[in-house]
């Protein structure tokens, strides 16, 4: 588990067993606390410090719940060896798909509120997943779907497994089985 969600499998990080260094590991930075701060202010006041941390790691993951589309160009320039990028509900998912192409893992943070009710709107869940997946397929994105931050399932634990079923169906519909 790395960053704000996801699995960090990679063949790009190599270390000597028993002598692992930061350069052999994933780094993670985010700025969700600055979601209402302008991209220019993030560039000036936050990214220089995040760059200093990120340069110590072999690969980097960036983002959590902040909308990334408005600050993407600055993040891309500041964070070395960036491989994974969080695309939250507060980002323009289409723009992020175009920006990331096949160069980064598109870590799509699905809204946990979709399954936080007793009876989820399955058609809405399906439609939203399909919109994102279709866009990502067109742009050649490497997509990861992340359902997290579930503090309640509307007293219906089946919501989680049903969401997985729907997600698998939509992935198969867009990408084939």
Go through the PLM ranges and name each one.
Residues 1-177:
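Active-site loop segments of alpha/beta catalytic cores
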């Amino acid at each position: 588990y790395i960053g704000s969600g996801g699995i960090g499998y990679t063949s790009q990080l190599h270390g000597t067993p028993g002598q692992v260094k930061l350069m052999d590991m994933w780094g993670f930075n985010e700025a969700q606390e600055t979601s209402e701060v302008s991209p220019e202010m993030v560039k000036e006041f936050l990214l220089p410090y995040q760059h200093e941390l990120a340069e110590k790691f072999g690969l980097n993951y960036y983002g959590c719940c902040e909308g990334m589309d408005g600050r993407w160009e600055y993040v891309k320039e500041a964070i070395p060896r960036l491989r994974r990028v969080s695309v939250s509900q507060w980002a323009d998912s289409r723009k992020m798909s175009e920006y990331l192409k096949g160069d980064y893992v598109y870590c799509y943070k699905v809204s946990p509120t979709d399954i936080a009710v007793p009876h989820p709107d399955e058609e809405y869940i399906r439609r939203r997943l399909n919109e994102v997946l279709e866009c990502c397929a067109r742009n050649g994105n490497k997509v990861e779907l992340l359902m997290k931050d579930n503090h309640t399932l509307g007293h219906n634990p089946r919501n989680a497994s049903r969401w997985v079923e729907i997600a698998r169906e939509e992935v198969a519909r867009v990408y084939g089985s």
